Amino acid sequence: MTRGFGPFGKIQEALKKAQEVRDGAQRLQKELEEMEIVGEAGNGLVKVTVNGNQEPLKVSLDPQVLQEPVDVVEDLLLTAMVNAYTQSAETMRKRMEELTGNISLPGLGLG
């Protein structure tokens, strides 16, 4: 309860909310590290897997794609990488928004 404490109550409430965000961020970090997001190209012939922090985990090539010219394989690999990275970055953005979206820090003009 912040009544009667004036600015001190607001500071205490802000510190409590900051701790909640910190705890949530730690949980989110672990969740992102464990997440696997797959980017594909060439109708699934090339797959790149990254975690929620955009760190590469695995590349998978269908043997059929190796019959293509090198430049085609390179383009497919790049497309799959960009796809995986984009999905991962969007997932991270949404999760961070969920974590901080409802946080307002009273009296500090931040919420």
Curated annotation (Swiss-Prot):
One of its GO terms (molecular function) is DNA binding. Its main location: cytoplasm. It is found in: Cytoplasm, Nucleoid. Pfam families: YbaB_DNA_bd. Keywords: Cytoplasm, DNA-binding. Coiled coil: none annotated. InterPro entries: YbaB-like_sf, YbaB/EbfC. One of its GO terms (cellular component) is cytosol. Binds to DNA and alters its conformation. May be involved in regulation of gene expression, nucleoid organization and DNA protection. Homodimer. Belongs to the YbaB/EbfC family. HAMAP family: DNA_YbaB_EbfC. This is Nucleoid-associated protein CYA_1369. It comes from Synechococcus sp. (strain JA-3-3Ab) (Cyanobacteria bacterium Yellowstone A-Prime).
